[in-house]
């Protein structure tokens, strides 16, 4: 597991959005085969809003192909539509429209949320359950525009924990085993098409396998949470 040092010393719901810098937009690592196999076995992981049509599908395909051709010119990746894209890369994918609507989802590794419940929702409706999000929700137009207009991709990191499985429920483990998950969330704007692509790269690690440095950081995160945040984030 990587990325946890990106989150800062105390817990915050602030977006923490950064420029992508030298990172690749789409990431392939040594667990590519594991991710893709789990995706192909997943069920109830692909959803579309009525606003999503063939024209939008073609624009998304064109954009992802362009990114892959630049970042991985020698990698043989073939897909013809949004569904096939999701089975070709390790990231989960969400498509957001400038009208403030989530219109496409290909999500096999959700972190304690149910994809079919979010499709068609606005930015504020999606984030309503998260304690402390009030000010961000009040400024939802700002954040929607930021996603859609991010021609130079931007990135943020989030973390959480869950029990009973590793990357997905298709990898069950002992119910009492705590798993730490991190997500690298990358936003790719397509302003000329009023679209934003949202990539989610999830990584996991058993809490018992983390080192002392991480566990002290984790302890400080919990201490700094409000009671509502503890209940939402870790079920306390």
Residue ranges of predicted features:
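Extended, well-ordered protein cores
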Residues: 1-236
């Amino acid at each position: 597991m990587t990325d946890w040092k990106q989150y800062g010393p105390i817990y915050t719901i602030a977006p923490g959005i950064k420029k992508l810098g030298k990172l690749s937009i789409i990431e392939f690592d040594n667990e590519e085969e594991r991710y893709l196999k789990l995706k192909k076995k997943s069920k109830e992981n692909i959803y579309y809003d009525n606003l999503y049509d063939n024209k939008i599908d073609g624009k998304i395909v064109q954009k992802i192909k362009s990114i892959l051709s630049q970042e991985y010119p020698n990698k043989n990746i073939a897909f013809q539509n949004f569904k096939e894209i999701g089975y070709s890369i390790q990231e989960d994918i969400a498509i957001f429209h400038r009208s403030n609507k989530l219109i496409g989802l290909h999500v096999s590794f959700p972190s304690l949320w149910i994809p079919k419940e979010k499709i068609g929702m606005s930015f504020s409706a999606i984030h309503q359950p998260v304690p402390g999000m009030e000010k961000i929700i009040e400024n939802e137009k700002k954040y929607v525009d930021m996603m859609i207009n991010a021609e130079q991709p931007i990135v943020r990191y989030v973390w959480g924990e869950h029990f009973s499985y590793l990357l997905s429920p298709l990898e069950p483990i002992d119910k009492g085993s705590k798993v730490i998950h991190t997500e690298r969330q990358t936003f790719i704007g397509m302003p000329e098409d009023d679209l934003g692509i949202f990539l989610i790269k999830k990584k996991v690690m058993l809490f018992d396998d983390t080192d002392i440095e991480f566990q002290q950081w984790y302890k400080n995160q919990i201490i700094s949470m409000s009671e509502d945040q503890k209940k939402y984030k870790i079920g306390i």
